[in-house]
């Protein structure tokens, strides 16, 4: 019996490793990825999420466009682990990217920044080889975004016009949940209005309430029976808010 076990031990170990890898990869989706051909290797400032220059440098430039994961702007700011599958060039962990744009190319789910594309590689030389390939096979899964020592920030866009039109984006959202609704509340009279996502990551209010404002966010639990959670900032947006300004919410999504 012992001799038989020793004879088949390599096969048994190989089977265990195969099953372990299959289990580990169960949460990954198989796809393809390309990259932005821009010269500065970071993301684009003209992404569909409307992040502007912030979107090019967010997450140290490890960003991506994705038509399938953009989801009419709901997917803006979501994080994904993306790893290429060529064993000669690719690292096992790949890279964590943030969705900042919508786009697809040559049957891909991701158009990565060059910075992110090369970070999937084992080495600098391997990264150069990946760029030469242009399009590579990948696996990906959604993961939690992490922004240590940062609160959620509200960026008032330059398209805003005080006091008649308020338009803003939500930056530095941790976790892996979607913001599915936003309320704009006047903090003195406690009157609130439900806002619409106008495009990309942009929320807007025509004739917003006067006075100090609280921007409250509803996070999806992902559960079929609800369990969605409101996050209420501890800081307010001042009564005399300004187009182009950023305001710290004082709160952050707590990672599990």
UniProtKB/Swiss-Prot annotation:
InterPro entries: Expan_Lol_pI, Expansin/allergen_DPBB_dom, Expansin_CBD, Expansin_CBD_sf, RlpA-like_DPBB, RlpA-like_sf. Residues 1-24 form the signal peptide. Glycans are attached at residues 27, 189, 240. SMART domains: DPBB_1 (SM00837). Keywords: Glycoprotein, Secreted, Signal. CDD domains: DPBB_EXLB_N. Its main location: secreted. It holds the Pfam family DPBB_1. Residues 46-150 form the Expansin-like EG45 domain. Gene3D superfamilies: Expansin, cellulose-binding-like domain (2.60.40.760), RlpA-like domain (2.40.40.10). GO terms for biological process: plant-type cell wall loosening. SUPFAM superfamilies: Barwin-like endoglucanases, PHL pollen allergen. Disulfide bonds: none annotated. GO terms for cellular component: extracellular region. It is found in: Secreted. Residues 164-249 form the Expansin-like CBD domain. Belongs to the expansin family. Expansin-like B subfamily. This is Expansin-like B1.
